[in-house]
A protein has these predicted regions:
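A conserved mid-protein helix/loop that constitutes part of the nucleotide-sugar donor-binding site
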Residues: 18-23, 181-204, 217-223
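Short His-centered aromatic/hydrophobic patch
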Residues: 71-77, 96-99
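Membrane-proximal helix-turn-helix segments that form the acceptor-binding/catalytic region
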Residues: 112-130
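A short, active-site helix/loop in glycosyltransferases that binds the activated sugar's phosphate group
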Residues: 125-149, 157-161
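Aromatic "clamp/platform" in nucleotide-sugar-dependent glycosyltransferases that forms part
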Residues: 240, 259
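Short hydrophobic beta-strand element within catalytic cores of glycosyltransferases
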Residues: 276-279
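Conserved acidic donor-binding segment of nucleotide-sugar-dependent glycosyltransferases
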Residues: 291-302, 310-316
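A charged, aromatic-enriched C-terminal amphipathic alpha-helix characteristic of glycosyltransferases
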Residues: 316-344
Length: 346
């Protein structure tokens, strides 16, 4: 059975939820389903192998022309709440890509996070199914929704391993690295990503340097911290780079020191490149991988982080073990089969 599927996102930008939709569209179209991506705001960083259409929030898409309407994000979810017909043939699904109150608490004060988060959850009352990114997140959202309305689906990443950076970028990084062991981070620079912990750890890792690919509101604070700790000569901020996974071949260690994550797509990117990974021991990472595949550290414990980085440097088998886990549980085939099952049995 082939389906006609509409995806709704805020804008076509290089962010986790939009990348997930891109993977969904690629997989669905490879299996002969028809897809359309609707979006609200300008931006064309991410391209899709299907029709895309910019819409205004107040205009209604033809819900009953589709088998599935799949929204991603606050505005798309609220859009479905307001525009879904009372007699709707299409099944409406949302994928929730975060831990809503927890995530908003890093952006707003706790009161605002609580109010906005709960209003968002209330707006999902008209959706037929709510998909989370993990079993842990499914449990988290059971505070708002019945078990029957919830399910989970692990993400995937399907990226080229031969993608390269420019000669100037490579020369800059090699000149910075020299004979050091290079820790790499690809992330938006926010407090939630926990990159400050890596800068703190450099004090005790004299033979290591840190390369950060990404932009964000915490950049200035991170730069100030590197100067305060007198390690600024061992930290290189590369700024925002499209397809940041292209930098993975130059890293000796890939770090994910996050305080909170909905999933962690960069973990899968590192797996595809067979990289040794150090990550915080938050529930989502503990669910996705085990200590034979990555080196965990205790969040906010710099001594634990230093130990994990040293161990990951010595354990050459981590990257291969992580890649095997990716093939077993997070491959595009696994991703497609899971979502197909969700779509068919709502």
């Amino acid at each position: 059975m082939t389906m006609n599927i509409a995806y709704i996102v805020p804008k076509l930008v290089n962010q986790g939820p939009v990348n997930v939709v891109q993977e969904l569209v690629k997989q669905m179209m490879q299996h002969q389903h028809t897809c359309t991506v609707y979006y609200f705001d300008e931006g064309n960083e991410v391209t899709f192998p299907c029709r895309t259409s910019r819409i205004r929030f107040r205009e209604r898409i033809p819900f009953n022309s589709y088998d599935i309407i799949h929204s991603h994000g606050l505005r798309p979810d609220v859009y479905v709440f307001f525009h879904k017909p009372f007699r709707c043939k299409a099944k409406c699904i949302t994928t929730v890509h975060n831990y809503v109150i927890q995530d908003f608490s890093y952006q707003y004060n706790k009161c605002t996070a609580y109010i906005v988060g709960n209003l968002w959850m209330w707006s999902l009352c008209r959706h037929d199914k709510i998909v989370t990114l993990s079993k842990d997140a499914e449990k988290y959202y059971s505070k708002w929704f019945s078990v029957k309305k919830l399910t989970f689906a692990y993400n995937t990443r399907d990226i080229p391993v031969d993608a390269s950076i420019t000669d100037n970028e490579e020369s800059q990084i090699l000149s910075f690295k020299r004979n050091s062991i290079l820790i790499g981070v690809n992330a938006a620079l926010t407090d939630r990503k926990g990159i400050d912990q890596l800068i703190e750890a450099l004090l005790y890792l004299e033979s290591y340097k840190l390369l950060i690919v990404g932009e964000g509101k915490s950049k200035e604070a991170l730069q100030k911290l590197s100067h305060k700790k007198k390690v600024s000569d061992r930290v290189l901020f590369m700024g925002y780079k499209k397809d940041a996974y292209r930098f993975l071949p130059l890293y000796d260690i890939f770090a994910l020191p996050s305080r909170s994550e909905g999933f962690g797509l960069t973990l899968l990117e590192a797996a595809i490149y067979h990289k040794s990974v150090v990550c915080s021991n938050i529930p989502i990472f503990k669910e996705l991988v085990d200590d034979t595949q990555v080196e965990f550290f205790e969040l906010e414990n710099i001594e634990s982080l230093v130990k994990a980085i040293v161990n990951a440097t010595q354990l050459k088998s981590l990257g291969e073990s992580l890649y095997k886990q990716y093939e077993l549980k997070y491959s595009p085939k696994c991703f497609y089969n899971r979502y197909l099952k969700i779509y068919l049995f709502i």
